[in-house]
């Protein structure tokens, strides 16, 4: 108990009390705003009409298509395949930041399977979640639509949000579609949100028949993979799209029974808010994902299958910033997520890309590789689109309300409450330690206008979809 007080309590729980003591009025207002769920943030900065182009529907701007094998890493879209449309497997890793995987340069041996399979694919090093909240990531990935700039879960606030899902697009092309997770889809209204989204089959822990829960979040990821393999083998006549979502890497990071813990935390304190447990669970999930690749090869579908692995958001463990869990900041450990695309048909040698992208770009990228046109209302762009924006947008709406944008190597963060600005050059400062805002006011002003355009585009986007009787609240940063 004493150890728990000094490791868990002192490092995290008391930190929440300190926030409340330092900002009581803001915390009270934020809690009211979160409970009300009807307001949207806006900035009053002036911006050019052209700044809204980042958020326009994809139907207003078509991209050329060329062979991906001759494309530069800056990204161009492949032409549609002439053979059977590829099977598509999308695996979303719960609470996994790029930093903690073996795909990044962090040195953690957590995902040896993904590292090995990347030899027949491409890894995107600068891919982002829009917020550290799973429900909002689901909405963005599935519908290629920016989530509302607010506090609430998109699945609960907008269960019937208009939009065309990637599953619907592919089902119209003859794909058999499915969604499988070892969690309970009743959480935050996911079951209702996924209803009528183009999935032939939707399965959660209740259909997996895998015994007792391993934690309050659901059964083991192993159970999901068992069901994935059965599902993929059930209908070989049609191409399929299977979206899956793991759960064991969610707090409390419960390891599978009988799996010994490995010393994966390196020089970090073993009981560093569950960091070592987290890394071990990620290692076990990676092992289970290896069974998916084995099943694809066993079925002889290696050249006819596209596997996409990404994360829903990051997870923080107190380094390099004083932040824990997720959704509290928009530093790299919170919002930069892995993205590996395994496609032996196109990639015979490992490739890496520095293209900046985000969750809204995932669906357009997948259908692009499959040779299928995107839904015209999608806001994202294929990561192989030569005319795509070099920017990614993200926000946090918990203890603070912060907006952020990554543009090439620059990352800009604005605290809407107090006007604090942070500017980092990620090309030389990967851990965001040197705030260059005072040295580059011109860059800050330009990127702040980009954020102002985002808030306006987001307001227009959700104007008709807002809950009945909604009003919006303008937050003006000091000096705005």
Stretch-by-stretch model annotation:
Residues 1-86, 118, 459-466, 474-480:
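N-terminal secretory/membrane-targeting segments
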Residues 72-79, 83-86, 97-176:
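His/Cys-centered metal/cofactor-coordination and adjacent catalytic loops
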Residues 136-217, 247-260, 266:
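Catalytic-site neighborhoods of secreted/periplasmic enzymes
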Residues 157-162, 273-275, 279-284, 331-335, ...:
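A short beta-strand-to-alpha-helix junction
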Residues 207-210, 228-281, 316-326:
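Active-site His/acidic residue clusters
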Residues 301-347:
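Histidine-centered active-site microenvironments of extracellular/periplasmic hydrolases
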Residues 316-317, 361, 367-426:
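C-terminal cap/loop subdomain of S1 sulfatases and analogous C-terminal strand-loop tails that border
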Residues 438-480:
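Long, internal low-complexity/basic segments
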């Amino acid at each position: 108990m004493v150890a728990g007080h000094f490791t868990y309590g002192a490092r995290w729980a008391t930190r929440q009390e300190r926030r409340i003591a330092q900002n009581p009025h803001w915390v009270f207002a934020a809690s009211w705003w979160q409970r009300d769920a009807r307001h949207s943030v806006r900035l009053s900065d002036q911006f050019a009409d052209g700044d809204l182009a980042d958020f326009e529907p994809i139907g207003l701007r078509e991209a050329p298509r060329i062979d991906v094998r001759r494309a530069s890493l800056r990204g161009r879209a492949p032409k549609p395949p002439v053979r059977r449309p590829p099977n598509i497997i999308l695996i979303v890793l719960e609470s996994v930041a790029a930093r903690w995987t073996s795909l990044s340069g962090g040195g953690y041996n957590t995902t040896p399977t993904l590292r090995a399979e990347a030899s027949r694919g491409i890894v995107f090093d600068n891919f982002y979640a829009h917020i550290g909240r799973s429900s909002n990531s689901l909405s963005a990935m599935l519908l290629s639509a920016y989530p509302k700039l607010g506090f609430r879960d998109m699945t609960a606030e907008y269960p019937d949000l208009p939009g065309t899902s990637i599953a619907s697009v592919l089902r119209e092309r003859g794909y058999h579609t499915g969604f499988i997770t070892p969690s309970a889809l009743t959480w935050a209204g996911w079951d209702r949100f996924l209803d009528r989204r183009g999935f032939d089959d939707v399965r959660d822990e209740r259909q997996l028949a895998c015994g007792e829960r391993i934690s309050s979040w659901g059964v083991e990821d192993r159970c999901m993979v068992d069901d994935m393999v059965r599902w993929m083998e059930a209908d070989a006549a049609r191409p399929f799209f299977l979206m899956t979502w793991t759960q064991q890497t969610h707090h409390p990071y419960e390891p599978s029974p009988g799996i010994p813990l490995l010393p994966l935390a390196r020089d970090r304190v073993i009981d560093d808010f569950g960091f070592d447990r987290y890394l071990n669970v990620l290692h076990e999930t990676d092992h289970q994902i290896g069974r998916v690749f084995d099943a694809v090869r066993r079925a002889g579908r290696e050249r006819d299958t596209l596997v996409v692995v990404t994360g829903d958001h990051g997870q923080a463990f107190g380094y390099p910033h004083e932040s824990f869990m997720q959704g509290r900041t928009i530093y790299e450990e919170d919002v930069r997520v892995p993205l590996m695309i395994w496609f032996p048909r196109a990639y015979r040698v490992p490739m890496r890309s520095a293209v900046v992208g985000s969750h809204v770009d995932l669906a357009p990228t997948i259908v692009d590789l499959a040779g299928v046109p995107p839904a015209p209302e999608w806001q994202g762009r294929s990561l192989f689109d030569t005319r795509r924006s070099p920017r990614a947008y993200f926000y946090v709406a918990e203890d603070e309300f912060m907006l952020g944008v990554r543009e090439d190597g620059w990352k800009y963060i604005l605290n809407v409450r107090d006007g604090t600005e942070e500017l980092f050059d990620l090309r030389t400062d990967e851990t965001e330690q040197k705030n260059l805002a005072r040295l580059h006011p011109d860059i800050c002003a330009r990127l702040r206008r980009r954020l102002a355009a985002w808030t306006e585009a987001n307001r227009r986007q959700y104007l008709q979809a807002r809950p009945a009787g909604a009003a919006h609240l303008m937050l003006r940063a000091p000096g705005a």
